[in-house]
């Protein structure tokens, strides 16, 4: 019975990891779009249109978004690794049960 509970736990964790990975990929995509938007915005702002401080603020915002993208990419890799480990545990459990 404990083995069955472990299988259920691992399967549920695997499904949760799938959802988290999809959510994380969406965050990467969204923040990448923001980085592109801010990069384009920087190209259009001219010194005679607005003060240099605005450019500095936008550059800082872009850097923040780039950092977020990097963090989400790292998190995605960690979640994928854990999902693969869960798949191995589940497969191993199924093989043990079949062998019984």
UniProtKB/Swiss-Prot annotation:
One Pfam family recorded for the sequence: DUF496
Return the similarity comment. Answer: Belongs to the pole-localizer TmaR family.
The organism sits in which domain of life? Bacteria
- Record carries keyword Membrane: no
* Organism field: Psychromonas ingrahamii (strain DSM 17664 / CCUG 51855 / 37)
Keywords (alphabetical) are: Cytoplasm
Q: What is this protein called?
A: Pole-localizer protein TmaR
**InterPro entries hit by this protein:** DUF496
Question: Where is it chiefly localized?
Answer: cytoplasm
Function as written in the Swiss-Prot or TrEMBL entry: Pole-localizer protein involved in the regulation of several cellular processes.
Keyword Cell cycle found: no
List the gene name: tmaR
